[in-house]
Amino acid sequence: MEINKLETFSNQYLSFVKLTTDTGDIGWGQMSTYHADITATIFHRQVAPYSIGLKLEEKPNFADHLQLIIEKEHKFPGSYLLRAIAGLDTALWDLYGKLHEKPVASLIGGKPGKVKIYGSSMRRDISPNEESLRLCKLRDELGISAFKFRVGAECGRNKDEWEGRSEEIVKVLSNDLGDNIQKLVDGNSCFSPQKAITLGKYMQGHGITHFEEPCPYWEHNQTKLVKEKLDIDVAGGEQDCDMSTWKSTLEKKVVDIVQPDVMYMGGLYRTLEVARMADEKGLPCTPHAANLSLVTICTKHLLTAIPNAGKYLEFSIEDETYYPWQKDIFYGDPFKVIDGFVEVTTDPGWGVEINLEWLENSDYQVTEIK
């Protein structure tokens, strides 16, 4: 069996990959969201040419092929290439799941079942009281027992979204959500070490348990300093996609919790490797999964399989009113939350079906054996 055709269906925000073998078997994957039309072009220029005609073994064993692409395209290291490779990786995992009539979770040592979530707010343009109303409503209606909200401004160079917002939202949500709800915050690379430490100690007094990306993510020594000065867990790694960076991060003990993103990393295989390296260092893995696309589906499968899975699956609380591009991507409701959990079903592959109407309205490209 070999790969015969690679098709992409894209818009500015999202791009799906359809992989077809010479036997007519099909797998569906996705490249990382945002500027996905650009990523699709990279896919057909720099990923698909190496993959058309690739002979596939009976069981998943294509990690070396992904590395080969990276080596062949060594003049183009970084995020865009790996975002494109993620489309191939995730399509192959879906293919193998369907060939073996198993969910991807079962192929990687996990199993179907429930996965606990934390509700992840993506908004900073919202007052603490308005955010409290949203999160308390989700707590009461969906049984969600952990939430993450935003402090500082994104890459804010030590500036708040507006003056005093960070301290206020910590105080308001800590009080309103109650002691039985786990409270996590995300700084999105905002703060200097000094400011992050000051805010972190304030948050410790308000029951916050997780401080994500407190300093510019590329400044590992700054993040490590914050980790060493605080009692709460410092998390990071969502932006990192290079294995040497991950090895350095883990050797230097920069964070308490690692957060690779399946789509930024180049797919499931490479994310599993980060999780394995973190496990060797005794660190939990709580991957980044910040929207309701295939990234969240892939991540819930992953969390059933790794021994160092974090407490929760990141689960965006933003629907199509905030992210219109998420509307009607899949048939059914693969993101249904019951009592604070989502489910990995027994359906083969990723267990989702992409909406045909969405595909018909996308931009199409193909690479195939002539």
What does each model-identified segment do?
Residues M1-W28, S32, T321-P324, D328-I329, ...:
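Structured beta-strand/loop patches that form or line metal/cofactor-binding pockets in enzymes
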Residues P49, P60, G207, W218-F341:
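Shared catalytic-loop signature of beta/alpha-barrel
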Residues D319-K370:
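C-terminal extensions of enzymes
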Residues G24, V47, L88, E101, ...:
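Conserved, mostly hydrophobic/aromatic
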Residues G29, I117-S120, S145-F149, K183-G187, ...:
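Hydrophobic faces of well-ordered beta-strands that scaffold small-molecule active sites
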Residues T20-L99:
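Metal- or metallocofactor-binding catalytic centers and their adjacent structured scaffolds
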Residues D89-D125:
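Glycine-rich, aromatic-flanked loop segments that form ligand/cofactor-binding clefts
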Residues K114-L230:
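Metal-dependent enolase-superfamily TIM-barrel catalytic cores that perform enediolate-based chemistry
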